[in-house]
A protein has these predicted regions:
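Transmembrane-lumen/periplasm boundary regions of multi-pass, lipid-linked membrane glycan transferases
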Residues: 41, 49-55, 78-88, 97-103, ...
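Transmembrane-helix motifs of polytopic, lipid-linked glycan transferases
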Residues: 112-133, 171, 175, 318-322
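Transmembrane-helix signature of polytopic, membrane-embedded enzymes
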Residues: 12-15, 125-148, 181-186, 190, ...
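Specific aromatic-rich, kink-prone transmembrane helix
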Residues: 165-181, 190-195, 344, 371-375
Length: 454
């Protein structure tokens, strides 16, 4: 992508901000406590590691065998349906030290690893917005909104399930968009691998494959793509996805189809350990029974300005889509917008309408946040386009200054709050919700207490 002379300072600023965020993450990843999921995820990863060694008959040191012998067999393990492919590199690092790593060190390692995944995802998100709108300023603002969201800022270090899934949702969004655009074997291979890792991280990701196929099919119909080419691509992506998913999920190795069906059943009847344990408007409720639960929590814990921008972007998207509905040739940008919308909305609607079990606030639905930020960037881009079209230089400069001041105030407020409340950004409530924050769940993971233990 060619960079114009006018854009070079903006790119330099973007690179500098990304570098600052990375250095900051490297400096503060040890400031956060440990949630209960981290220990559980480590044990599940070790159980899968043991099964892999035994099933493939890999030669390993006796000290590994002795350590792993105390773990249950995967097929009898209660959490066997949870994938751990993304955590296996951490198990290998522990194994290199014969599993003698102190608890503090492997928790620190996991925090840093979770941050690396999230950091990479933010860069991919920037690239997605840059490619979609062709404007580096829009991409930078979108990136800043994603990074400077208080709860995500904190959980990017210790939430090794929901944040990892959100990060890989972004990777999936980027690779699917590129696959539909390029239609090559290489892009199909990469997309299938990313989708498989996303599904392995959380079964909700299984919705992404049919969404990708449906949008590819719609795009193929509107562009009058040859049926044989389209069918080949769809069969290829489906086949590669299954191969990758089975390969990285040891629980599927013996009987892939029956075990996959068992996994679906387990997910549908998932035990609700937090039933009647979610403080919501001053009452303890079962979150899965309230259809407004997720929406309310999103409104409570996301900076209000971000949500207003996103709502405006969504309205503009539908307006532009219906205005162009008679256009014979679709724009690639419309495909990207539809993909971003459906990848967030479809799984969310399923969870809400089917009363799927939800634990603690809306963290099980964090995957929808990239969609929220995407349409906030949509609104920003349309505003920038309107400003650039103003004929009068003086009026244009005045309006641009006002818009810039509003954006700086909005994003800056979140950034200042993050800095002042470090490392307790997980307790963030949007300004309108703060007077009633005590009526809702707070530190459900007891992170401050766990920090003192570790």
């Amino acid at each position: 992508m060619k960079i114009s002379r006018r854009e070079k300072p903006l790119y330099a600023l973007t690179i500098a901000l990304m570098a600052v965020y990375f250095v900051l993450g490297c400096g503060i990843f040890d400031d956060y406590g440990c949630g209960p999921d981290e220990g559980i995820e480590r044990q599940t990863s070790l159980v899968n590691f043991r099964y892999t060694i035994e099933r493939l008959r890999l030669p390993v040191p006796d000290r590994w065998t002795t350590f792993l012998a105390y773990l249950p067999d995967l097929k009898e393990y209660r959490d066997r349906y949870y994938g751990t492919a993304l955590h296996q590199p951490l198990v290998l690092i522990e194994a290199m030290g014969n599993f003698t790593m102190p608890a503090r060190d492997f928790y620190r390692m996991r925090h840093f690893y979770t941050f690396l995944n999230w950091y990479a995802a933010t860069i991919f998100f920037y690239a997605l917005i840059r490619r979609r709108f062709g404007d580096p300023l829009t991409a930078l603002i979108g990136w800043l909104i994603l990074v400077l969201t208080p709860r995500f800022f904190a959980e990017a270090f210790y939430n090794n399930k929901d944040i990892l899934f959100t990060a890989w949702t972004i990777f999936s969004l980027c690779t699917v968009d590129r696959w539909i655009q390029r239609k090559t074997v290489r892009s199909a291979l990469l997309t299938a691998a990313v989708l498989a890792l996303t599904v392995n991280t959380r079964l909700n990701g299984l919705a992404y494959l049919p969404i990708a196929i449906a949008i590819y099919f719609i795009s193929a119909l509107r562009t009058k793509e040859k049926p044989r080419v389209a069918l080949t691509q769809l069969l290829l992506i489906g086949f590669l996805f299954l191969i990758f998913l089975i390969a990285i999920t040891p629980n599927l190795w013996e009987s892939p189809l029956p075990t996959l069906i068992e996994t679906f059943r387990f997910s549908a009847a998932h035990p609700n350990h937090s039933a009647q344990g979610n403080l919501f408007f001053g009452k303890l409720i079962d979150a899965s029974l309230s259809r407004r639960y997720v929406a309310v929590w999103i409104a409570l814990t996301t900076p209000t300005g971000y949500l207003i921008l996103s709502a405006a972007g969504l309205i503009l998207f539908f307006f532009e889509t219906f205005r162009r509905r008679k256009t014979s040739e679709p724009r690639p940008s419309q495909r990207s917008d539809l993909l971003a919308l459906t990848i967030g909305a479809v799984p969310l609607l399923y969870i809400v309408l089917r009363h799927v079990t939800i634990y603690n606030t809306w963290r099980h639905c964090y995957f929808v946040y990239p969609t929220i930020v995407y349409f906030a960037a949509f609104a920003v881009n349309r505003s920038i386009s309107k400003l650039r079209a103003v004929p009068s230089p003086n009026v244009r400069a005045g309006m641009a200054g006002l818009a810039a001041a509003c954006l700086i105030a909005m994003i800056g407020e979140s950034g200042v709050w993050i800095a002042r409340n470090h490392p307790y950004q997980f307790a963030y409530f949007a300004p309108p919700a703060r007077p009633n924050a005590e009526a809702f769940s707070g530190d459900y993971w007891q992170l401050p207490d766990r920090k003192s233990v570790v």
